[in-house]
Amino acid sequence: MVLQHTDSTVPQAAAQAAGTVIAFGQASDMAAYGPMPRVSSIIDDCALYYIARTKAVMDGTWNSTSTWDGIGAGMVGIGEISNAVPADVKASAEALRNSLADGSYHAFTGPLNKQDGSAWLAAGETASDYGDDSLAGMN
């Protein structure tokens, strides 16, 4: 399995050439560069954000702010899940994606521990985006 965190087609093409290496793309839909065996791609789409921020500059309403959008806002997406994934697994993945998007599931829900094994989130507790011990400050 090749899962890269670079917006490059090379890992997809290399997996395609190897023939038996499954790939998962990053930043844009990589299907054309390694159609099979491929699972999907994370797709970053900041277009609506950039349009809104540009309009705010133009109409004088711009202010500095942190942005932490994801699947629900459309800033991050999951591309088409290929036939390399069994239908039942694909359906489960799509249901999970949809629950992340509508907020009914939070990916960081306890119990979760930190890398050193110490407790981070208690059972049922969800991580906050900002503040002490938040997702934005995770390292």
Question: Where do the PLM segments sit?
Answer:
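A residue-level marker of the well-folded mature domains of exported/periplasmic proteins
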Residues: 1-139
